């Protein structure tokens, strides 16, 4: 059976379900799949297909994730659902599944629970920009006042973590009843889909963002000058553009005088392409791997930041022992390792393999970074953790 042709005629948006264990994330995922397939066409995925999440490896970390797709009249969605809490933590920190928005599932029979809070905090730390709430199991609550109380509680919790709790959409429904085909509850799934369409703005495509290319290699070509190679992370670079070389050393400006791909000369290099960029008047020794080439003023070098980190377990090939304050591993950003020191939160003495933890990192030399940048923590080339820049300090 040939795979269906991927049509790019609709904007593509990445979403996912988050929330406490057993609040109905996977059931909701199945319900969305069924109701939208029934209403707008497409393939419906069963609960068992979604629940049996395949194992993936991202930066050496084992994560179980289910990916499903569905359509509304105006958009195409890719949706991730994870079976276990640890999978969410790993997924969000490594950016294995970057979300343009998340659906927070809260059982109205329980109200917000510890992982509800933790997933909201993680969403804030890793930069999930929008959250929509689906209050599940509303068929099991007869008291309208109780539903109102749970909704207020969820909204307050979201506001506590700087999400617009008073303004974001909250849909009251029942994933199970919708999955069983009861029209009044199916209507709530359509309402949820409409909220996704209207509340989550269309994500800016990588190609429309300011140009950035991590430098992987530097060559000098006699008679032509210095060429840096790498994969363009975002934006477009055109011949004649002014660019900055950022990170590790003092930021310098130069001009792109040529773009090459597969030995062919081009006018421009675009997001996702591997290319060589010829720099005017730049010496071979002025640039090194680990720096980035970027649109002037679009990114700055920093050394100190707050991060959210997942420490690999022993089974994942991580450390066998905890680490303490004063730990000095390497932090791998894009293409290079930089040594740094860590500061643990107050009251935390040690960090065990398998933990996730907030820490302040100070690097020995500056790296071009924005909030949301992912990194690995390594010891002698072996990955022992994964992290994300949550807040830049200096």
From Swiss-Prot:
UniProt-annotated stretches for the region G3: 81-84
Region (G4): 136-139
Region annotated G1, chain positions: 19-26
Compartments reported by the entry: Cytoplasm
Positions annotated to bind GTP: 19-26, 81-85, 136-139
InterPro entries named in the record: EF-Tu_GTP-bd, EF-Tu_GTPase, EFTu-like_2, EFTU_2, G_TR_CS, P-loop_NTPase, Small_GTP-bd, T_Tr_GTP-bd_dom
Assigned GO CC terms: cytosol
Pfam families membership: GTP_EFTU, GTP_EFTU_D2, GTP_EFTU_D3
The reaction(s) this protein catalyses: GTP + H2O = GDP + phosphate + H(+)
Annotated Mg(2+) binding sites: 26
Region (G5): 174-176
Function of the protein: GTP hydrolase that promotes the GTP-dependent binding of aminoacyl-tRNA to the A-site of ribosomes during protein biosynthesis.
Family that this chain belongs to: Belongs to the TRAFAC class translation factor GTPase superfamily. Classic translation factor GTPase family. EF-Tu/EF-1A subfamily.
Protein's UniProt name: Elongation factor Tu 2
Protein encoded by which gene: tuf2
């Amino acid at each position: 059976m040939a795979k269906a042709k991927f049509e790019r005629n609709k904007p593509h948006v990445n979403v996912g379900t988050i929330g406490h264990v057993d609040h109905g994330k996977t059931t909701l995922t199945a319900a969305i799949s069924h109701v939208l397939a029934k209403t707008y066409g497409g393939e419906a995925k069963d609960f068992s297909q979604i629940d049996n999440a395949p194992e993936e490896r991202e930066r050496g970390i084992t994560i179980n994730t289910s990916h499903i797709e569905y359509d509304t009249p105006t958009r195409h969605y890719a949706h991730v659902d994870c079976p276990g809490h640890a999978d969410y933590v790993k997924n969000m920190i490594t950016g294995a599944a970057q979300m343009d928005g998340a659906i927070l599932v809260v059982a109205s029979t329980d109200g917000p629970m510890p992982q509800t809070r933790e997933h909201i905090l993680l969403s804030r730390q890793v930069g999930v920009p929008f959250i929509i709430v689906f209050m599940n199991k509303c068929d099991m609550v007869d008291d309208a006042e109780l539903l109102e109380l749970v909704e207020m509680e969820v909204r307050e919790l979201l506001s506590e973590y700087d999400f617009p709790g008073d303004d974001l959409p909250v849909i009251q429904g029942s994933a199970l009843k919708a999955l069983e085909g009861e029209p009044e509850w199916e209507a709530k799934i359509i309402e949820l889909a409409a909220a996704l369409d209207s509340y989550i703005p269309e994500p800016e495509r990588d190609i429309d963002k300011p140009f950035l290319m991590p430098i992987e290699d530097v060559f000098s070509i006699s008679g032509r000058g210095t060429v840096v190679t790498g994969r363009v992370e975002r934006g477009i670079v055109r011949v004649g553009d002014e660019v900055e070389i950022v990170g590790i050393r003092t930021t310098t400006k130069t001009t792109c005088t040529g773009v090459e791909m597969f030995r062919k000369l081009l006018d421009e290099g675009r997001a996702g392409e591997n290319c060589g960029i010829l720099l005017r008047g730049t010496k071979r020794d002025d640039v090194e791997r680990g720096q980035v080439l970027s649109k002037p003023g679009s990114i700055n070098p920093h050394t100190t930041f707050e991060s959210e980190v997942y420490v690999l377990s022993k089974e994942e090939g991580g450390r066998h022992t905890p680490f303490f304050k004063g730990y000095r591993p390497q932090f791998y950003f894009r293409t290079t390792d930089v040594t740094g020191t860590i500061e643990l939160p107050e009251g935390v003495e040690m960090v065990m393999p398998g933990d996730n933890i907030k820490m302040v990192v100070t690097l020995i030399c500056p790296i071009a970074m924005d909030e949301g940048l992912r990194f690995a923590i390594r010891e002698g080339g072996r990955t022992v953790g994964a992290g994300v820049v949550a807040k830049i300090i200096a």
